[in-house]
C-alpha cells in the first residue's frame, strides 16, 4: 500500500472509533439519567412519609 492509502485507512479507523465512542457515551448518559430519576423519586417518596422523614433527616435536608 502507498502512503496515501495507509493515511486514508488510518483516518477511517479514527472516524469509526470516534463515532462508536460518542454513540455509546450518549447511551450511558441516558442510563445515568434514568437511574438518577429513580433515586430522586425514591427520596421524595421517603420525604413525603413522616415516619421515614424522621428516621432519615439527612436525606430530606433536615438536620437534627
Curated annotation (Swiss-Prot):
Residues 48-50 are annotated as: Ser-Xaa-Pro motif, crucial for potent interaction with nAChR. It is found in: Secreted. GO terms for molecular function: acetylcholine receptor inhibitor activity; toxin activity. It comes from the Eukaryota. GO terms for cellular component: extracellular region; host cell postsynaptic membrane. The modification Cysteine amide is found at residue 60. Keywords: Acetylcholine receptor inhibiting toxin, Amidation, Disulfide bond, G-protein coupled receptor impairing toxin, Neurotoxin, Postsynaptic neurotoxin, Secreted, Signal, Toxin. Expressed by the venom duct. Belongs to the conotoxin A superfamily. Alpha-conotoxins act on postsynaptic membranes, they bind to the nicotinic acetylcholine receptors (nAChR) and thus inhibit them. Shows inhibition on alpha-3-beta-2/CHRNA3-CHRNB2 (IC(50)=75 nM), alpha-7/CHRNA7 (IC(50)=637 nM) and alpha-9-alpha-10/CHRNA9-CHRNA10 nAChRs (IC(50)=1000 nM). In addition, it also shows inhibition on high-voltage activated (HVA) calcium channels currents (30% at 100 nM) that are mediated by GABA(B) receptors (GABBR1 and GABBR2). The cysteine framework is I (CC-C-C). Alpha4/7 pattern. Negative results: does not show activity on alpha-3/beta-4 (CHRNA3/CHRNB4), alpha-4/beta-2 (CHRNA4/CHRNB2) and alpha-4/beta-4 (CHRNA4/CHRNB4) acetylcholine receptors. This is Alpha-conotoxin Vc1.2.
